[in-house]
Amino acid sequence: MPKHDDTLISTAGVDADVGYGAVMPPIYLSSNYSFSAFGEKRAHDYCRSGNPNRDMLVEVLSQLEQGAGGVATSSGMSACDLVLNLIEPGSLVIAPHDCYGGTWRLFTARAKQKQIEIAFVDQHDRQALAAAFARKPALLWIETPSNPLMRVVDIEALVKEAKAVASKVVVDNTFLSPALQKPLSLNADFVVHSTTKYLNGHSDVVGGAVIAANPADAEQLKWWANCTGVTGAPFDAWLTLRGLRTLNLRIERQQASAGVIAERLAQHEAVSVVHYPGLKSHPSHAIAAKQQLGFGAMLSFEIAAAPEHVRDFIAALDVFTLAESLGGTESLIAHPATMTHASMAPEARACAGIDDRLLRVSVGLEHVDDLWAALSRALAVLPAPKQRAARRLEAAK
């Protein structure tokens, strides 16, 4: 087997077509497959249960994540929900208090249905974590870097604590992908992805994946995926595998640009704070440098102006597209409070530190100079520092 990820993803599915010798894998759209004889099932019988395109995608993702197998699902959220089937009803799940809004919504909804018990915990708060682990959780959910505040936790250290109370560990690796982080090598039990993001990388697929560290868990995932019908479509799997082939090349460029933009934003007078693990000022920079292979292409920042000026900034911004999602070739900007995290209760957003002035950036493949020029022009429309100071004084009276 190839030793390098670049070779793995470039050769995945190549020469798989033994019938016609197609170099690139065909799209297998058939909903069902014939039996070779009575009682003799082939490798596939029904598309919900198995499909060659999904198999190829899961195989290469398992290799990249150093796992034992898993499932390609219809979305990132269905991947998250699939994992919950592997724990007993009513079991406790510990999740980060600053997780993606869709994850927060899912766990909150499942808790209301009494399917799970949920504890949203600041995973940097040692006392809060110790109290949560004392309750013997069945599952520890990690999102690192977190969405949208780019907080980083020590996966290996948290896994050790979780294993001490017999808890399984899931890591959402969407923000970095296996190109930059391999949680299973740090002893996590599961990795989840929204394959919509960096893995596909072209903003034309919605999908998800769960990869397990051990074969028994992988088989359980497959059984539940077939049972609940959350498996992804063949064409989506084919598109994702096609996009995956350029993953390392894309991330290398995107990450380089993100680092430049983060440094410049951090020095700009119209920006109050920048969240990017690659900055030496980031509180978890050392942890990120230890467990990641790079700092990624996602960042967020707060404007140094009142929340109502976010609208002015967005109106003046070009090159970037105002949209949810991330990880595509195009640069995106989002306002978490009204977009990606709008489903979170306002008090939950406040607890997580998601301010109304916060903007999240997914850096694409455009030239970094064009991206910075666009940001600079938009930042220039914000009130000047003296005006901001005067308004703060006026507000304090």
How should each PLM-predicted stretch be described?
Residues 240-249, 296-304, 360-364:
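Short, well-ordered beta-strand elements within core beta-sheets of diverse protein domains
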Residues 27-28, 36-56, 60-63, 332-357:
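Glycine-rich phosphate/pyrophosphate-binding loop
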Residues 1-27, 210:
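Short conserved active-site loop signatures built around small residues
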Residues 70-268:
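Conserved PLP-enzyme active-site core in the AAT-like
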Residues 1-6, 14, 52, 273, ...:
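Positively charged, small/polar-rich N-terminal and surface patches that mediate targeting and assembly
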Residues 32-86, 102-109:
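Conserved N-terminal alpha-helix of the aminotransferase class I/II PLP-enzyme fold
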Residues 259-327, 331, 344-350, 389:
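Conserved small-domain helix->loop->beta segment predominantly found in fold-type I
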Residues 117-119, 135, 315, 331-397:
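PLP-dependent enzyme catalytic core of the Aspartate aminotransferase-like
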